[in-house]
Amino acid sequence: MEKLGMNEIREKFLSFFESKGHLRLPSFSLIPKNDKSLLLINSGMAPLKPYFTGKETPPSKRVTTCQRCIRTPDIERVGKTARHGTFFEMLGNFSFGDYFKKEAIPWAWEFVTEVLGLPVNRLWVSIYEEDDEAFEIWNKIVGLPPERIVRMGKEDNFWEIGTGPCGPSSEIYFDRGEEKGCGKPTCGVGCDCDRFIEFWNLVFTQFNKDEQGNYHRLPNPNIDTGMGLERIATIMQGVDSIFDVDVIRGITNFVSQIAEVEYGKDAEKDVSLRVITDHIRGITFMISDGILPSNEGRGYVLRRLLRRAARHGKLLGINDTFLYRVVDSVVENYGEAYPEIIDRKDYIKRIVKLEEERFKETIDQGLTILQDYINELKVQGKTVLEGSKAFKLYDTYGFPLDLTKEILQEAGITVDEEGYTKELEKQRIRARSSRKEDNSLWEQDIYSTLGDIKTKFVGYDTYESNSKVLAIVKDEELVEEAEAGDDVSIILDVTPFYAESGGQIGDNGILENENVLIKVKDCKKVGDRFIHIGTIERGLISVRDEVKAQIDVVSRRNAARNHTATHLLHKALKEILGDHVHQAGSLVADDRLRFDFSHYQAVTKEELKQIENRVNEKIYQSLNVHIEEKTYDEAVKEGAVALFTEKYGDKVRVVKIDDYSMELCGGTHVKNTNEIGIFKIVSESAVGAGLRRIEALTGLAAIKYLEEKEEILKEASDLLKAQDKEIVSKIESLQQVLKTKDKEIEQLKIKMASILANSLINSAISLDGIKVVVSKVEDYDSEALKALGDILKDKLKTAAIVLASSTPEKAIFVGMATKDVVQKGINMGAVIKEVCKVSEGNGGGRPDMAQGTGKNPSKVEEALNKAIDIVKEQLKN
């Protein structure tokens, strides 16, 4: 058989199924769209789920894709085995109620034997033990001998997750030869050894499983197949590991050059090389798809991969930041198949380098502390690290728990994960959000039971429509009618209401006829159904009733102003900050807009001014807004901006602002930029690593904001008795005066503290040659008490000091001791702990310095008497 590279196999697969009437779709983003059950896309089928469930209409009944995927459950095994990886590509052909087994099986066989040229005598298949139909097709139509068709049980050859669509599967195996086997007489398809490699899974979704566990035949069964590109490449190239495949090996070699080590010479170093090679691929595509490092959700997965790869770089002796350089190799090897990473290369490298530098600042210190923990545990003969210590490594040094666990595992130590979790909750630190898949992958919500009900949206052209009620949902149940006071969700056949999407809020308004008035507060979309959410103000509404649907026109126009302004802002950001800027999220409301975007540092005052001026310049130029429908490919070729996180059909809506801006967008817009009136930025802030946020106002909201600012300016001018232009210099002058006064006050405090210290020294008692000062001081906080204690220590040279103060709510205690006194047995941590207990509080610290508070300030004197007793006792012992 011919040796084929990954890029060749990918293209051959997609071209083959195109020849069978399939629509080739580009890989979807790793960020799932409208799917809370998934953190990241982890299979070829995952982004197509809405088509399988009927929530959305597929662009074709036959589809083929090569989908990039991320899976991290086996992250600890990556690099240690030949097959495990977190990033992979899944080839697939799919049928949505079109063809079934009679086509899917022969096509699969045709591809592997005729296109790939795999030898027939080395191919085996497995089927579900009760699937006689699949057996007949493999045997009679394909011509595979019965002995090469292995029947297997539900665990191996039946696909189901919770309830919903499911069905038997058939898998194709490649026999790598006896020399790769385990040598057991029972060795065959399904054996755990490396001889028989499963590389293509054909799933026949022909049943629907109900909550009672019963299976019902689907009227229109589906086909869902998946073939791991890396795995079939190992077969085609005759190699044992995915890390020896051409494209992936190219990245490994690049890392080897940086590390100055040769791959294949040292088992431990090879593990690190493979970890880096795997992780940098996922890192590159995650950042390209708009994910940024953070401490939760997808961002946490990315940070975890980055820091794990960085640590393995350190194990290879690479002490400088280097991962950002490896991005070049990923782009070189994958850019042909995924040209978007070529365009985003500089941005990806910048984010990787920033995160590397952030981790580099703390990793050495963190590793030293972790090694100390390991040494302590070994001395103590223990094998479990306290959860609080693992948390400290995470909180202070940025070590994800998994990284700590992995390093400890190498030393035969585990982590008290329960204790770690408790620390997270106690400290109110947001932990990584490992969203688990729902019991049902298919999200059988109320709206998915409505069959072919669809809503026609007419809101681009009109603000009202005569509509029919198709369904009413009340208390999460479908009902035939609802009455005044009920909160309802209503689906209409036709609507002018814009449903929340693309960052733009849903319309509000009313539904009414002579019998009913419903105040609609929001409108959302589930598949092709528009859900009008509101409250019945009067009357009764029933399914099939006719109503007039009217939106709040003022609210819609304000949202349109903000949406068009958002497009102008996006373009202005790219022009002024650079092409690396990509939209990462937005909110288009009727009273404001918010825009999140990728940028590696705070936007300067001067840049913000330029951005605001650029947007207003385009508003005043009265640019026309043109809206057209085009094919996705046409729009992108013409330069339309598409968002990473959106999923587009074959036909797209293009919003073009003359020759200035062009984006794919389903939102509502003004007809001319002069309708926006004015654009005003009100804030710029960070929302994550490499992620910034601008909030802005337009139209009357912006004018009102400026009027409020003007009023504040006038009040300041009146108070300062200064002209507007003089306000800043007047404030600076006052600040200088205050600074001088503060210095004078500070000097007076020092003098007073010195006088007070002399007074306290005069009242000090002597115990075994040690001066002991125990006293209450009025109107001092803990910092002032510590400063006074330092003066006393300096003056007395050999001293034990306990000072207290109080407010109506609490008592404050500070204990201090000189080094020689500590050597004589004084421990202020123990003294303050007991003293605070007397006044119903808590405290503690080091032998030479401790502090605490008490809830009962009336017991300060009693507590101080206790302090003298404890000091005496400590000196005796």
Curated annotation (Swiss-Prot):
<feature type="binding site">
    <location>
        <position position="669"/>
    </location>
    <ligand>
        <name>Zn(2+)</name>
    </ligand>
</feature>
<keyword id="KW-0067">ATP-binding</keyword>
<keyword id="KW-0547">Nucleotide-binding</keyword>
<dbReference type="GO" id="GO:0008270">
    <property type="term" value="F:zinc ion binding"/>
</dbReference>
<protein>
    <recommendedName>
        <fullName>Alanine--tRNA ligase</fullName>
        <ecNumber>6.1.1.7</ecNumber>
    </recommendedName>
</protein>
<dbReference type="InterPro" id="IPR050058">
    <property type="entry name" value="Ala-tRNA_ligase"/>
</dbReference>
<keyword id="KW-0820">tRNA-binding</keyword>
<dbReference type="GO" id="GO:0140096">
    <property type="term" value="F:catalytic activity, acting on a protein"/>
</dbReference>
<dbReference type="Pfam" id="PF07973">
    <property type="entry name" value="tRNA_SAD"/>
</dbReference>
<dbReference type="GO" id="GO:0006419">
    <property type="term" value="P:alanyl-tRNA aminoacylation"/>
</dbReference>
<dbReference type="InterPro" id="IPR012947">
    <property type="entry name" value="tRNA_SAD"/>
</dbReference>
<dbReference type="InterPro" id="IPR009000">
    <property type="entry name" value="Transl_B-barrel_sf"/>
</dbReference>
<dbReference type="InterPro" id="IPR018163">
    <property type="entry name" value="Thr/Ala-tRNA-synth_IIc_edit"/>
</dbReference>
<keyword id="KW-0648">Protein biosynthesis</keyword>
<dbReference type="InterPro" id="IPR003156">
    <property type="entry name" value="DHHA1_dom"/>
</dbReference>
<keyword id="KW-0436">Ligase</keyword>
<dbReference type="GO" id="GO:0004813">
    <property type="term" value="F:alanine-tRNA ligase activity"/>
</dbReference>
<dbReference type="InterPro" id="IPR018165">
    <property type="entry name" value="Ala-tRNA-synth_IIc_core"/>
</dbReference>
<dbReference type="GO" id="GO:0002161">
    <property type="term" value="F:aminoacyl-tRNA deacylase activity"/>
</dbReference>
<dbReference type="Pfam" id="PF01411">
    <property type="entry name" value="tRNA-synt_2c"/>
</dbReference>
<dbReference type="GO" id="GO:0005829">
    <property type="term" value="C:cytosol"/>
</dbReference>
<dbReference type="GO" id="GO:0000049">
    <property type="term" value="F:tRNA binding"/>
</dbReference>
<feature type="binding site">
    <location>
        <position position="563"/>
    </location>
    <ligand>
        <name>Zn(2+)</name>
    </ligand>
</feature>
<dbReference type="InterPro" id="IPR018162">
    <property type="entry name" value="Ala-tRNA-ligase_IIc_anticod-bd"/>
</dbReference>
<dbReference type="InterPro" id="IPR045864">
    <property type="entry name" value="aa-tRNA-synth_II/BPL/LPL"/>
</dbReference>
<dbReference type="Pfam" id="PF02272">
    <property type="entry name" value="DHHA1"/>
</dbReference>
<dbReference type="GO" id="GO:0016740">
    <property type="term" value="F:transferase activity"/>
</dbReference>
<keyword id="KW-0030">Aminoacyl-tRNA synthetase</keyword>
<keyword id="KW-0479">Metal-binding</keyword>
<feature type="binding site">
    <location>
        <position position="567"/>
    </location>
    <ligand>
        <name>Zn(2+)</name>
    </ligand>
</feature>
<dbReference type="InterPro" id="IPR002318">
    <property type="entry name" value="Ala-tRNA-lgiase_IIc"/>
</dbReference>
<dbReference type="InterPro" id="IPR018164">
    <property type="entry name" value="Ala-tRNA-synth_IIc_N"/>
</dbReference>
<comment type="similarity">
    <text>Belongs to the class-II aminoacyl-tRNA synthetase family.</text>
</comment>
<dbReference type="GO" id="GO:0005524">
    <property type="term" value="F:ATP binding"/>
</dbReference>
<keyword id="KW-0694">RNA-binding</keyword>
<keyword id="KW-0862">Zinc</keyword>
<comment type="function">
    <text>Catalyzes the attachment of alanine to tRNA(Ala) in a two-step reaction: alanine is first activated by ATP to form Ala-AMP and then transferred to the acceptor end of tRNA(Ala). Also edits incorrectly charged Ser-tRNA(Ala) and Gly-tRNA(Ala) via its editing domain.</text>
</comment>
<keyword id="KW-0963">Cytoplasm</keyword>
<dbReference type="InterPro" id="IPR023033">
    <property type="entry name" value="Ala_tRNA_ligase_euk/bac"/>
</dbReference>
<feature type="binding site">
    <location>
        <position position="665"/>
    </location>
    <ligand>
        <name>Zn(2+)</name>
    </ligand>
</feature>
